Amino acid sequence: MTSFSIEAPAKVNLTLHVVGKRDDGYHLLDSLVVFAGIGDTLEFSPAETLSLEVTGPTASQIPDGENIVLKAARLLAEATGVTKGAAIRLTKRLPVAAGIGGGSADAAAALKGLMRLWGVAPPAETLRRVALSIGADVPVCLAGTPMRMMGVGEVLEPAPTLPPAWLVLVNPLVPLHTPPVFKARTGPFSAADPLTAPPRDAKGLAEALAARRNDLTPPAITIEPVVGEVLAAIAATADCLLPRMSGSGATCFGLYAEEAQARAAAAQLGAAHPAWWIAPAQLLS
């Protein structure tokens, strides 16, 4: 088999309600998850041993130690009895610890690519178990389409059909790790409030999202006040239908109806904040 590549698109939480907490300390979520037309790329080649090369604009942000891609590879090999290797090349474009599932998307792409490379097709339940053992966002990234994500990430339902729309992703290049954000959350839990009807257009989607929220935004701003600055900067761009934080931050996004509007907003933000990571991207449906 020759080499091939698989994309690992950014995950975006359009909504994120914290609805409860398990006895083991894990929080229960109800989240509308979509994917953006920007991400990392994984290239797979046959090899006798398992290896990973990381390149790309944000490769230097990856901490030393075992990469989540290698973890995914080893867990899949254990679950399927595979003894083959693979040469994996990860081109890293997404910022790390950013709330857009970069590592989880990479792990999901690794599972997809290695199943193809190794010629294995584990049962759906086995694959789900492997994905969840890697990380809470890996199952939804493995699905790769708009989903309502519940539980700790293991319960997935297809989302209503979403209209064409564009996003501008903005990260101030401040890593914001998930556990401290959850720990800083205060107040009662939210009710689940899923999107049930397909919005008619991007404006309708923004209206539906505005009636919901990301419960992790206040604690994220408490830890890193720059998140509030990012949201304000996005809100100030022309044609922005909605500014919001994704996941546990620090990446935020603006929602726009048209590509030209998103690109103009990204240019405006980039001129004002050259040190931030800014990327316009289509909302993938």
Curated annotation (Swiss-Prot):
Catalytic activity of the protein: 4-CDP-2-C-methyl-D-erythritol + ATP = 4-CDP-2-C-methyl-D-erythritol 2-phosphate + ADP + H(+)
Signal peptide: none
EC class: transferase
Binding site for ATP: P95, V96, A97, A98, G99, I100, G101, G102, G103, S104, A105
Active site per database record: K11, D137
GO molecular function: 4-(cytidine 5'-diphospho)-2-C-methyl-D-erythritol kinase activity; ATP binding
Protein's pathway: Isoprenoid biosynthesis; isopentenyl diphosphate biosynthesis via DXP pathway; isopentenyl diphosphate from 1-deoxy-D-xylulose 5-phosphate: step 3/6
Biological-process GO terms, alphabetical: isopentenyl diphosphate biosynthetic process, methylerythritol 4-phosphate pathway; terpenoid biosynthetic process
Pfam families, sorted: GHMP_kinases_C, GHMP_kinases_N
Coiled coil: none
Documented EC number(s): 2.7.1.148
Record keywords, A-Z: ATP-binding, Isoprene biosynthesis, Kinase, Nucleotide-binding, Transferase
NCBIfam families linked: ispE, PRK14608.1
Function description: Catalyzes the phosphorylation of the position 2 hydroxy group of 4-diphosphocytidyl-2C-methyl-D-erythritol.
Similarity comment: Belongs to the GHMP kinase family. IspE subfamily.
The protein's name: 4-diphosphocytidyl-2-C-methyl-D-erythritol kinase
